[in-house]
């Protein structure tokens, strides 16, 4: 992960990393659209490997956003509203969508992948808040466990939330950040390996390809002021927008 202090402005700006995350996510979701299931083919595997760059970058910037925000409630509210909108976009874009009842959580009978990753990102933000509360450790642990249960049905389950907690609570200590994230992602990969698909379980470990990129983060925004203004909302709004687009393509062209 990245250091808290930035001795040099060389490297990648936050806007560059966010743009990279957007491109990787788009490629990943196009792969799910064109190659449903878990095909062991070079093209979809390559696209999914590149797509593993997205979640760690998102988690990192949620943790950074928590550190820098001047209004936590507004930040959390925006993320909550985005999670609600993204839920409908996520289900509409997924192979599980059939009709309006598909939008009802757990209607399919599964407890996994019932909503988008933004729900887990929100859970991670709330975990950081809980971690900073002035209360007994057992109360913090209980609240974090509750948030794990609430985010478990989301894409990336509670793992994304726990990674945000690890990154934010160990800010300035890249070794601890990486150690805890490695533990959580390995756990996720193991569950994926034994319950869904072995090859794609191993593929989840490709999230660590994002570590060298995050180490290059220089803590700065783009020198292009217009790009910087656009990237701030686009980084979040692009998620539901591109999923709605994928859903439309699936409905009208691939059904």
Residue ranges: model-predicted function:
Residues 1-255:
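Alpha-helical transmembrane segments and their immediate juxtamembrane cytosolic regions
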């Amino acid at each position: 992960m990245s250091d808290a202090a930035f001795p040099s402005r060389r490297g990648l700006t936050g806007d560059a990393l966010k743009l990279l995350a957007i491109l990787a996510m788009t490629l990943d979701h196009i792969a799910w659209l064109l190659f449903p299931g878990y095909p062991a083919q070079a093209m979809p595997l390559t696209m999914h490997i590149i797509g593993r760059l997205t979640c760690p970058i998102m988690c990192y910037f949620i943790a950074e956003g928590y550190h820098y925000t001047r209004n936590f409630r507004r930040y959390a509210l925006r993320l909550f509203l985005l999670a609600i909108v993204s839920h409908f976009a996520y289900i509409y874009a997924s192979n599980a969508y059939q009709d309006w009842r598909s939008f009802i959580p757990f209607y399919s009978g599964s407890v996994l992948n019932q909503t988008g990753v933004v729900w887990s990102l929100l859970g991670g933000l709330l975990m950081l808040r809980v971690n900073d509360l002035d209360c007994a450790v057992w109360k913090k642990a209980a609240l974090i466990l509750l948030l794990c249960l609430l985010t478990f049905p989301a894409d990336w389950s509670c793992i994304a939330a726990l990674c945000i907690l690890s990154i934010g609570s160990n800010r300035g200590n890249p070794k601890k950040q990486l150690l805890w994230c490695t533990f959580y992602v390995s756990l996720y990969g193991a569950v994926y390996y034994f319950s869904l698909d072995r090859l794609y379980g191993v593929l989840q470990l490709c999230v660590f390809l994002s570590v060298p990129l995050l180490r290059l983060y220089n803590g700065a925004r783009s020198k292009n002021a217009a790009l910087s203004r656009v990237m701030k909302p686009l980084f979040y709004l692009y998620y539901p927008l591109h999923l709605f687009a994928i859903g439309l393509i699936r409905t009208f062209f691939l059904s």
